[in-house]
From Swiss-Prot:
Miscellaneous: According to PubMed:10383955 the levels of SodA activity and sodA expression are growth-phase dependent, occurring most during post-exponential phase. This response was also dependent on the level of aeration, with highest activity and expression occurring under high aeration. Transcribed from two sigma-A-type promoters (PA1 and PA2). Transcriptional data show an indirect repression of PA1 promoter by sigma-B.
Gene transcribed to yield this protein: sodA
Cofactor binding description: Binds 1 Mn(2+) ion per subunit.
Stored Gene3D superfamilies: Fe,Mn superoxide dismutase (SOD) domain (1.10.287.990), Iron/manganese superoxide dismutase, C-terminal domain (3.55.40.20)
Organism (species): Staphylococcus aureus (strain NCTC 8325 / PS 47)
Subunit structure: Homodimer. Can also form a heterodimer with SodM.
Entry binding sites for Mn(2+): 27, 81, 161, 165
Keyword field: Manganese, Metal-binding, Oxidoreductase, Stress response
Biological classification of the source: Bacteria, Bacillati, Bacillota, Bacilli, Bacillales
Any GO BP annotation: removal of superoxide radicals
One term under GO cellular component: cytoplasm
Name of the protein described by the UniProt record: Superoxide dismutase [Mn] 1
C-alpha cells in the first residue's frame, strides 16, 4: 500500500464534549479510511505510489487525466484529514509565534476567530476552512470538497472540516455551534510548528 491511514494522536473520546467519540470513530475509521483505500486504488501501478501526498496534491496538473479526479478527491481527503487530526488536541493553549502574528494582522485573536468562523459557516455545501501562509502573510480561505490550498501554492497551517460528516451526529444542522466548539480543541502548538516551517 502506498498510503496508510494514520493513527489518531489521542483517544477517540479525548476531545469530548466538543467533538464526540462516535463522530471521531466514524470520521477516522470509515470516512478517512475510505479516502485512503480509493487513493491507493487510483495510483496503483503509477509513479505516484512513490510520491508524498503533499507533492501529489501540490502538483495535481501533472497527475494523469484518467485518474486526476479520483486523486484530487481522495488524495485531498487523505491529506486534509491527516493534517486535521494533528491540528486537534485535548490540551488547547493559545500561544506561540503564530498567535502573535494573528493578533498583529487581525488586531485580536477574537477578530481572527470571527472572520474564520464566518467564512467556515458561509462555505456552501461540503468543504474546508483554512488559515494559510501566502507569500509570508496569513490568510483565511475556504476550499470546496476535499481541495487543499497547496494546489494554489498556499500552505495550510490550520484547517476545519465543514463536511456534514464531521459534525452532524452531535450538532445536526448547527454548523456554527460546531465551529465554535472547534476553538476549544485547536492544537496551537502544531499550528505554530507549521507556521514557523514556512519561514
Amino acid at each position: 500500500m502506498a498510503f496508510e491511514l494514520p493513527k489518531l494522536p489521542y483517544a477517540f473520546d479525548a476531545l469530548e464534549p466538543h467533538f464526540d467519540k462516535e463522530t471521531m470513530e466514524i470520521h477516522h475509521d470509515r470516512h478517512h479510511n475510505t479516502y485512503v483505500t480509493k487513493l491507493n486504488a487510483a495510483v496503483e501501478g503509477t509513479d505516484l505510489e512513490s510520491k508524498s501526498i503533499e507533492e501529489i496534491v501540490a502538483n495535481l496538473d501533472s497527475v494523469p487525466a484518467n485518474i486526476q479526479t479520483a486523486v484530487r478527491n481522495n488524495g485531498g481527503g487523505h491529506l486534509n484529514h491527516s493534517l486535521f487530526w494533528e491540528l486537534l488536541s485535548p490540551n488547547s493553549e493559545e500561544k506561540g509565534t503564530v498567535v502573535e502574528k494573528i493578533k498583529e494582522q487581525w488586531g485580536s485573536l477574537e477578530e481572527f476567530k470571527k472572520e474564520f468562523a464566518d467564512k467556515a459557516a458561509a462555505r456552501f455545501g461540503s468543504g474546508w476552512a483554512w488559515l494559510v501562509v501566502n507569500n509570508g502573510q496569513l490568510e483565511i480561505v475556504t476550499t470546496p470538497n476535499q481541495d487543499n490550498p497547496l494546489t494554489e501554492g498556499k500552505t495550510p497551517i490550520l484547517g476545519l472540516d465543514v463536511w456534514e460528516h464531521a459534525y452532524y451526529l452531535k450538532y445536526q444542522n448547527k454548523r456554527p455551534d460546531y465551529i465554535g466548539a472547534f476553538w476549544n480543541v485547536v492544537n496551537w502548538e502544531k499550528v505554530d510548528e507549521l507556521y514557523n516551517a514556512t519561514k
